Amino acid sequence: MLYALATGLSAIFTPLNALTYLTSRIILGALTALLLSIFCGGKMIRYLQKMQMGQFVRDDGPKTHLKKAGTPTMGGALIIFSITVSMLCWADLRSVYTWLALFVLLGFGAVGWTDDYLKLVKKNTKGLAAKQKYAYLSLVALLTALWLYFLADTPIETTLIMPFFKHFEWQMGILFIPFVYLVLTGASNAVNLTDGLDGLAIMPVVLVSGGLCIFAYLSGSANFALYLHIPAIAGAGEMAIFCAAIAGAGLGFLWYNAHPALVFMGDVGALSLGAALATVAVVVRQELAFAVMGGVFVAEALSVMIQVGSYKCRGKRVFRMAPLHHHFELGGWPESRVTIRFWIITVVLVLVGLSTLKLR
């Protein structure tokens, strides 16, 4: 809205042109989401406390987590609100990518919100039935995959790009649809599994969104894309604003989620953020680079798959407890050490992911 207003009034007051540049809108998108998240966070926490929407803690997990019982959750709604307002202010509302991003964010967020609501308000400790939850997530992911497939104007928009290789590409055709479906559902659940310690999931989300913001900015420029041998995607610049808003809202949420956390994001935040990052990666054709940058999320998800598979096949567990962060906790690592080391790993992985821009 503010972008459209600045565009319309720039002919009368030329300094407003500065607000129409993509770089300006990226910065303003991040700042808007950050400030909204910080200033609205306190009120949301008090509301959640008043409504007694406190976290349920399993008694078979690390004993240090028992003190977290009752901490307000569903704080992810604050993140979604901040991102949405920021996008409506600074993104180009004529761009289909703006609405695609919001559709995924709100769609996955709605499933997570329903799950959290049933757990916390209706006191149904299991929330949505597993099949129900999977069906709803699958529906949103499949609609997104179909949207992107039929939106594609050029073959490159449905081509899988291999990092570190300049000419290794695979035109997926109709297989693009199930591929996108798997990327979205996989990423959303991976972030959800990572969200088990104070600040553990949100900082990697911020860091990965920063990396994807750079990819989106460069892919949206035909000149940069040609120089770097990456796909040129018209309109991808709006996804850079989306990434900036995610990073800003995430940092604002971390203000309250840092140890000891005053609020947790819940499924409403984790599912939506994972899918949002995956959507950006799909649009800019950097799914494999996204897997590298989000290596912490991948490791957390794989640890659960390995643990379950090993127990079912051999009757033995590979890890002390899954997801992976609990394995280290039960090994004697303090919560803050696990969290910060996972942050450091993510910084390194994001840099490795960005290095694919030149190392080909």
Swiss-Prot record:
Catalyzes the initial step of the lipid cycle reactions in the biosynthesis of the cell wall peptidoglycan: transfers peptidoglycan precursor phospho-MurNAc-pentapeptide from UDP-MurNAc-pentapeptide onto the lipid carrier undecaprenyl phosphate, yielding undecaprenyl-pyrophosphoryl-MurNAc-pentapeptide, known as lipid I. Its EC number is 2.7.8.13. Keywords: Cell cycle, Cell division, Cell inner membrane, Cell membrane, Cell shape, Cell wall biogenesis/degradation, Magnesium, Membrane, Metal-binding, Peptidoglycan synthesis, Transferase, Transmembrane, Transmembrane helix. It holds the Pfam family Glycos_transf_4. GO terms for molecular function: metal ion binding; phospho-N-acetylmuramoyl-pentapeptide-transferase activity; UDP-N-acetylmuramoyl-L-alanyl-D-glutamyl-meso-2,6-diaminopimelyl-D-alanyl-D-alanine:undecaprenyl-phosphate transferase activity. It comes from the Bacteria. It catalyses: UDP-N-acetyl-alpha-D-muramoyl-L-alanyl-gamma-D-glutamyl-meso-2,6-diaminopimeloyl-D-alanyl-D-alanine + di-trans,octa-cis-undecaprenyl phosphate = di-trans,octa-cis-undecaprenyl diphospho-N-acetyl-alpha-D-muramoyl-L-alanyl-D-glutamyl-meso-2,6-diaminopimeloyl-D-alanyl-D-alanine + UMP. The chain crosses the membrane at residues 19-39, 73-93, 95-115, 136-156, 173-193, 199-219, 233-253, 263-283, 288-308, 338-358. The keyword Iron does not apply. It is found in: Cell inner membrane. It is a multi-pass membrane protein. It is an enzyme of class 2 (transferase). The gene is mraY. Pathway: Cell wall biogenesis; peptidoglycan biosynthesis. One of its GO terms (cellular component) is plasma membrane. InterPro entries: Glycosyl_transferase_4, PNAcMuramoyl-5peptid_Trfase, PNAcMuramoyl-5peptid_Trfase_CS. Its cofactor is Mg(2+). GO terms for biological process: cell division; cell wall organization; peptidoglycan biosynthetic process; regulation of cell shape. Belongs to the glycosyltransferase 4 family. MraY subfamily. This is Phospho-N-acetylmuramoyl-pentapeptide-transferase.
